[in-house]
Amino acid sequence: MRLRLLVSVGVLLVALLPSPPCRALLSRGPIPGARQASQHPQPLSFFQPPPQPQEPQALPTLLRVGEEYFLRLGNLDETRAAPLSPAASPLASRSSSRLSPDKVAANFFRALLQPRRPFDSPAGPAERGTENALGSRQEAPAARKRRSQEPPISLDLTFHLLREVLEMTKADQLAQQAHNNRKLLDIAGK
C-alpha cells in the first residue's frame, strides 16, 4: 500500500514540476529535418523559467464545435480568408498561390468562432441568399429531427464507453481480489 502511495506521489511530482520546453518544437527551421544552431547556448536549468522568444507564442485554443472539441495551435486572428477555388482542393496541382494547411485550418476555425444568429431570428439579405442557395428554411426542423434520432457520437459516447470500461475493470478487480482472498483462506485453513 505504501509503495503504491509513494509511486503515485512520485508520478504526480514529475508531472506537475515545471519543465523546459522541447527544443525540437522551439527551433522550427525552414527545411524540415535540417539541424539549426541552438537559440539558447546555455543549458536550461530544471527550475529556471524558459527564456521568452522574440515573437509571442501562439497559445493552444480549445474550440467546441457541436459536441466535439478541437485543440488548435496557431493564430486564429489572421484576416486572410481561405480561397474557395479548385486550386485549394487537395487533389489540385500544387501552386505557389495555395495556402498552407495551417492557414486553411485557421480560417476554418475562425469561421466557426464567428457568432451565430438564433434559428428564430429573421435572416439578413446576405443570409437569405445563402438560405435560398442551400434550400428552404422548412427543411431545418426535419434535419434537426433526423440528427436527434441518430445515436450519440463524440464526447458523450466516449465518456459512456469510458464509464463502462471502468465499471468492467472494477468488477474484474473485485473478482480477482475475491479469488486471492479464497486462496489465502485455503492456504491458512490447511
Swiss-Prot record:
The modification Alanine amide is found at residue 188. It is found in: Secreted. The keyword Signal applies. It comes from the Eukaryota. GO terms for cellular component: extracellular space. Its main location: secreted. PROSITE patterns: CRF. One of its GO terms (molecular function) is corticotropin-releasing hormone activity. Keywords: Amidation, Cleavage on pair of basic residues, Hormone, Secreted, Signal. Produced by the hypothalamus. Residues 25-147 form a propeptide. Residues 33-57, 116-151 are annotated as: Disordered. Residues 1-24 form the signal peptide. InterPro entries: Corticotropin-releasing_fac_CS, CRF, Urocortin_CRF. One of its GO terms (biological process) is negative regulation of glucagon secretion. Hormone regulating the release of corticotropin from pituitary gland. Induces NLRP6 in intestinal epithelial cells, hence may influence gut microbiota profile. Belongs to the sauvagine/corticotropin-releasing factor/urotensin I family. Interacts (via C-terminus) with CRFR1 (via N-terminal extracellular domain). This is Corticoliberin. It comes from Bos taurus.
